[in-house]
Amino acid sequence: MFSVNNTHSSVSCSPSINSNSTSNEHYLRILTEWEKNSSPGEERGIAFNRLSQCFQNQEAVLNLSDLNLTSLPELPKHISALIVENNKLTSLPKLPAFLKELNADNNRLSVIPELPESLTTLSVRSNQLENLPVLPNHLTSLFVENNRLYNLPALPEKLKFLHVYYNRLTTLPDLPDKLEILCAQRNNLVTFPQFSDRNNIRQKEYYFHFNQITTLPESFSQLDSSYRINISGNPLSTRVLQSLQRLTSSPDYHGPQIYFSMSDGQQNTLHRPLADAVTAWFPENKQSDVSQIWHAFEHEEHANTFSAFLDRLSDTVSARNTSGFREQVAAWLEKLSASAELRQQSFAVAADATESCEDRVALTWNNLRKTLLVHQASEGLFDNDTGALLSLGREMFRLEILEDIARDKVRTLHFVDEIEVYLAFQTMLAEKLQLSTAVKEMRFYGVSGVTANDLRTAEAMVRSREENEFTDWFSLWGPWHAVLKRTEADRWAQAEEQKYEMLENEYSQRVADRLKASGLSGDADAEREAGAQVMRETEQQIYRQLTDEVLALRLSENGSRLHHS
């Protein structure tokens, strides 16, 4: 599976293929001609170097990500992994026959070419796809979220991971028996797909929240306890919810774990103009100017739901009871009006909040404040204040651990509104863990299932993991990397060079050694996992060394400390 955070994709190794001088010259001519036709902003020079090196050294992995490329040349035929995420590609060339992994996330693709039968992982998140080609029989992972898909082709029997959220699907094809993770939230689904009725050994997690499903099939109750199914945010009737509650509360219930929300079936889709919702947070003497500014954003994506979120936020217990809350929101809205990127991120975060209960709105407010702080860090606010950046990183780390703890707690409950669980840990531990982004009150703590003992255990776990893991985590944190790129450019370049040298000289052998030691040579799944582990270990080592060097210099200058008392 391709990583979404600090590590690159796992990779797999192909046998070396000898290329003669004639084919070398021919391919280099193709690359040279392609490089000459570069458009402004493209980094085809870097791409040329990586392509020629990959071809001449018969490297299994070709990484052309983050180069603003608008097209690709003919690809080396021997590669088994192609990474071209974060470019401006509108199409892909013919794919190599032995390709196993393709990552083309965050491009402008409207179609993708015929897929080779060898492909096991396809990741084309955040493109403009309206349909997919026939899927190869060996495919185990398919990530196509945030596209424009109206339907899916038949799913391969070996498929284990399927992400299709933020599309336009009204139905899903039958689900393969081996499917473990399905993320189909935020579509237009009106019915459930056909589930496998076999007894399962592996846990299955299926997410259908925020669709248009109104009823549940009778077979739903026949599923075994290996299933975790999220149906929150669907227009389910009160009768259906009551039936589910009776079913899951039975002492002899051994069926699936079902997630719902406190306001299912009661969503209110009415909203007022965005500018009106925003100006309501400002003093009367500022409202005219604010309204004029925000009128320009009325047609941005998720503007309507953001308007509804602001109205819901004003009705939370924090808005009513917390001194200075309105001023805090107004200051935040001013920052959004000045940054299109931050506004886009915030609109997206708030998109789901109006379709659930008040505590969902409160949790979303927490997440929006996190988004603001991380954005400010990435944009340079803390470039000259490493102590403040460390404090922010420490808070983000604590929140991440609390999310892990909440996730584990949710697994112990049968009929769960998971929002209440997540918010309970943040709200009830906000003071003890110094969580500046957490609201101090919530409405439905009583139904969260979180006990006083849970909170004591959580606090102890956060502090223990912080002591042992924080510096490693911080060394891989995106905002810290952004600071290093700006303020320590030479050191950062050296670290990146170390990483690419490892990819060229050590990576394949380390993966092969790991597979051999575990007796899993030739196992594609094990190969991907081993590749991801090797890559993460390498990045951890390189970035930790860089982090230690920079922090030792900066903290000694201002008297700050890395370790928190």
UniProtKB/Swiss-Prot annotation:
Pfam families: LRR_TTSS (PF12468), NEL (PF14496). The keyword Secreted applies. Residues 263-270 are annotated as: Linker. Residues 1-22 are annotated as: Disordered. SUPFAM superfamilies: L domain-like (SSF52058). GO terms for biological process: effector-mediated activation of host programmed cell death by symbiont; protein ubiquitination; symbiont-mediated suppression of host programmed cell death; ubiquitin-dependent protein catabolic process. GO terms for molecular function: ubiquitin protein ligase activity. It catalyses: S-ubiquitinyl-[E2 ubiquitin-conjugating enzyme]-L-cysteine + [acceptor protein]-L-lysine = [E2 ubiquitin-conjugating enzyme]-L-cysteine + N(6)-ubiquitinyl-[acceptor protein]-L-lysine. Ubiquitinated in the presence of host E1 ubiquitin-activating enzyme, E2 ubiquitin-conjugating enzyme and ubiquitin. Pathway: Protein modification; protein ubiquitination. Changing N146A: Does not affect ability to interact with host GSDMB. GO terms for cellular component: extracellular region; host cell cytoplasm. Residues 1-262 are annotated as: Interaction with target proteins. Residues 273-565 form the NEL domain. Changing C357A: Abolished ubiquitin ligase activity and ability to ubiquitinate host Nlrp1b, GSDMB and GSDMD. It is found in: Secreted; Host cytoplasm. LRR repeats lie at residues 58-79, 80-97, 98-119, 120-137, 138-157, 158-179, 180-199, 202-223, 225-248. The LRR (leucine-rich repeat) domain forms a slightly curved solenoid and may mediate interaction with target proteins. E3 ubiquitin ligase effector protein that interferes with host's innate immunity. Functions to alter host cell physiology and promote bacterial survival in host tissues. Catalyzes ubiquitination of human gasdermins GSDMB and GSDMD, promoting their degradation by the proteasome, thereby preventing cell death. In contrast, activates host cell pyroptosis in mouse cells: catalyzes ubiquitination of mouse Nlrp1b allele 1 protein, releasing the cleaved C-terminal part of Nlrp1b, which polymerizes and forms the Nlrp1b inflammasome followed by host cell pyroptosis. Belongs to the LRR-containing bacterial E3 ligase family. This is E3 ubiquitin-protein ligase ipaH7.8. It comes from Shigella flexneri. The lineage of its organism: Bacteria, Pseudomonadati, Pseudomonadota, Gammaproteobacteria, Enterobacterales. The gene is ipaH7.8.
